[in-house]
Amino acid sequence: MDIDNFKSVNDTLGHAGGDEALKLLADTMRLVFGTHVLMARFGGDEFVLCIQNRDQEGVQAQLDKLVRSMCQTFTYGGCSVPLSISLGAVYMTEKFPYEKLFKEADSVLYEVKTRGKNSFEIWKI
């Protein structure tokens, strides 16, 4: 998952504003998922969510809520920018190495961003 057009957020609001946008995302993820998910910043504006033992429909509803919650105008220091996220997810039916999961999730994320961002998609592997 990453913040759409994060470079323009940083360019407009400065790095302190970008940091606040990242904090908003982390806080929103906590509200949506609670303690039932492992969340980690993967680098820059990219995050990884690891959700175990959940039904696909429930996860889909939570991801939809997260994407909708993050689609907003974000204001920092008197300046405002549009904010949204794109998310690629994989739903595994058997065990895979983490490297494969990350690679597949990154491929899904690329597809979402190619189609226009501010969305999510889940691939079953």
State what each model feature region is.
Residues 1:
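Active-site flanking residues adjacent to catalytic metal/cofactor-binding acidic residues
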Residues 11, 52, 113-114, 125:
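Short, conserved catalytic or interaction motifs in soluble domains
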Residues 41, 89, 121-124:
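Structural signal for conserved beta-strand scaffold positions within catalytic alpha/beta enzyme cores
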Residues 4-34, 40-44, 48-49, 56-64, ...:
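Conserved long alpha-helical elements within nucleotide-processing catalytic cores of c-di-GMP signaling
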Residues 41, 70-86, 113:
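Catalytic core regions of nucleotide second-messenger enzymes
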Residues 50-52, 90:
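Short hydrophobic/aromatic beta-strand micro-patches
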Residues 60, 64, 77, 91-121:
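Catalytic-core segments of nucleotide cyclases and related cyclic-nucleotide turnover enzymes
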